[in-house]
Protein backbone atom coordinates (compact mmCIF):
# COMPACT_ATOMS: atom_id res chain seq x y z
CA UNK A 1 0.00 0.00 0.00
CA UNK A 2 1.15 3.54 -0.66
CA UNK A 3 1.69 6.16 2.02
CA UNK A 4 0.52 9.76 1.56
CA UNK A 5 3.18 11.75 -0.28
CA UNK A 6 3.36 14.97 -2.23
CA UNK A 7 0.75 17.71 -2.10
CA UNK A 8 -1.57 16.51 0.67
CA UNK A 9 -1.04 18.33 3.96
CA UNK A 10 -0.28 15.95 6.81
CA UNK A 11 -3.21 17.28 8.87
CA UNK A 12 -5.79 16.53 6.17
CA UNK A 13 -5.86 12.81 7.02
CA UNK A 14 -4.87 12.04 10.59
CA UNK A 15 -6.22 9.74 13.31
CA UNK A 16 -5.93 8.98 17.04
CA UNK A 17 -6.44 5.43 18.35
CA UNK A 18 -7.63 4.08 21.72
CA UNK A 19 -7.61 0.36 22.53
CA UNK A 20 -6.91 -2.18 25.22
CA UNK A 21 -3.47 -3.80 25.22
CA UNK A 22 -2.98 -7.11 23.44
CA UNK A 23 -0.05 -8.84 25.09
CA UNK A 24 -0.21 -12.49 24.08
CA UNK A 25 -1.95 -14.10 21.11
CA UNK A 26 -1.94 -17.59 19.61
CA UNK A 27 -0.12 -18.05 16.29
CA UNK A 28 -2.45 -18.30 13.30
CA UNK A 29 -5.65 -17.43 15.15
CA UNK A 30 -8.23 -14.89 14.05
CA UNK A 31 -9.01 -12.28 16.71
CA UNK A 32 -11.50 -9.42 16.91
CA UNK A 33 -10.08 -6.28 18.52
CA UNK A 34 -12.34 -3.41 19.55
CA UNK A 35 -10.91 0.08 19.32
CA UNK A 36 -11.96 3.70 19.06
CA UNK A 37 -10.61 5.84 16.25
CA UNK A 38 -10.94 9.63 16.22
CA UNK A 39 -10.68 11.72 13.06
CA UNK A 40 -8.09 14.32 14.12
CA UNK A 41 -7.57 15.60 10.58
CA UNK A 42 -9.36 18.27 8.57
CA UNK A 43 -11.00 16.00 5.94
CA UNK A 44 -14.06 13.79 6.41
CA UNK A 45 -13.57 10.04 5.97
CA UNK A 46 -15.85 8.49 3.37
CA UNK A 47 -17.13 4.97 4.05
CA UNK A 48 -18.21 4.17 0.47
CA UNK A 49 -16.54 3.83 -2.88
CA UNK A 50 -13.41 2.13 -4.19
CA UNK A 51 -11.04 4.17 -1.98
CA UNK A 52 -13.22 4.44 1.13
CA UNK A 53 -11.52 4.91 4.50
CA UNK A 54 -10.74 1.69 6.40
CA UNK A 55 -8.73 0.70 9.45
CA UNK A 56 -5.66 -1.38 8.74
CA UNK A 57 -3.03 -3.27 10.67
CA UNK A 58 0.70 -3.67 10.06
CA UNK A 59 2.56 -6.56 11.73
CA UNK A 60 6.32 -6.02 12.15
CA UNK A 61 8.97 -8.41 13.39
CA UNK A 62 11.71 -6.37 14.99
CA UNK A 63 11.42 -2.65 14.37
CA UNK A 64 11.29 -2.58 10.59
CA UNK A 65 10.58 -6.00 9.02
CA UNK A 66 7.00 -5.82 7.72
CA UNK A 67 5.33 -9.24 7.99
CA UNK A 68 1.88 -8.23 6.75
CA UNK A 69 -0.48 -5.30 6.33
CA UNK A 70 -4.19 -5.77 5.95
CA UNK A 71 -7.42 -3.79 5.84
CA UNK A 72 -9.25 -5.03 8.94
CA UNK A 73 -12.32 -2.85 9.57
CA UNK A 74 -14.47 -0.75 7.25
CA UNK A 75 -16.22 2.33 8.60
CA UNK A 76 -19.94 1.93 9.40
CA UNK A 77 -20.64 5.53 8.30
CA UNK A 78 -18.76 8.65 7.19
CA UNK A 79 -16.59 10.16 9.96
CA UNK A 80 -16.32 13.95 10.22
CA UNK A 81 -13.32 15.78 11.69
CA UNK A 82 -13.44 15.50 15.49
CA UNK A 83 -15.80 12.52 15.41
CA UNK A 84 -14.95 9.17 17.05
CA UNK A 85 -16.05 5.78 15.75
CA UNK A 86 -15.92 2.39 17.47
CA UNK A 87 -14.61 -0.39 15.25
CA UNK A 88 -14.26 -4.16 15.56
CA UNK A 89 -11.08 -5.11 13.71
CA UNK A 90 -10.76 -8.71 12.52
CA UNK A 91 -7.04 -9.43 12.63
CA UNK A 92 -5.03 -12.50 11.64
CA UNK A 93 -2.19 -13.31 14.03
CA UNK A 94 1.10 -14.28 12.33
CA UNK A 95 1.67 -18.04 11.95
CA UNK A 96 5.10 -18.10 13.59
CA UNK A 97 5.65 -17.54 17.32
CA UNK A 98 7.80 -14.59 18.35
CA UNK A 99 7.66 -10.97 19.41
CA UNK A 100 5.87 -8.66 17.00
CA UNK A 101 4.80 -5.05 16.81
CA UNK A 102 1.16 -4.59 15.80
CA UNK A 103 0.63 -1.09 14.38
CA UNK A 104 -2.69 0.53 13.49
CA UNK A 105 -3.21 2.89 10.56
CA UNK A 106 -6.14 4.31 8.61
CA UNK A 107 -6.31 4.30 4.82
CA UNK A 108 -8.29 6.72 2.65
CA UNK A 109 -8.02 7.90 -0.94
CA UNK A 110 -6.25 4.53 -1.57
CA UNK A 111 -3.26 5.48 0.61
CA UNK A 112 -2.24 4.92 4.24
CA UNK A 113 -2.41 8.02 6.46
CA UNK A 114 1.14 7.69 7.75
CA UNK A 115 4.13 8.95 5.85
CA UNK A 116 7.59 7.37 5.92
CA UNK A 117 9.14 8.24 9.26
CA UNK A 118 5.80 8.77 11.06
CA UNK A 119 5.26 6.89 14.29
CA UNK A 120 2.31 4.50 14.07
CA UNK A 121 0.04 3.70 17.05
CA UNK A 122 1.54 0.34 17.95
CA UNK A 123 1.81 -2.28 20.65
CA UNK A 124 4.16 -5.14 21.33
CA UNK A 125 2.53 -8.57 21.04
CA UNK A 126 3.96 -11.95 22.01
CA UNK A 127 2.75 -14.65 19.58
CA UNK A 128 2.80 -18.17 21.06
CA UNK A 129 1.77 -21.66 19.91
CA UNK A 130 -0.77 -22.09 22.74
CA UNK A 131 -2.00 -20.07 25.68
Predicted regions and their residues:
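Short beta-strand and strand-turn-strand segments in soluble, beta-rich domains
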Residues: 14-17, 58-75
Amino acid sequence: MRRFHGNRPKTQYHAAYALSPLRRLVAGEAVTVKLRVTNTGTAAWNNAGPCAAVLGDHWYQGRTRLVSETEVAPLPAPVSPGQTVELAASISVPDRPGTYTLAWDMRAQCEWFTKPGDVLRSQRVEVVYTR
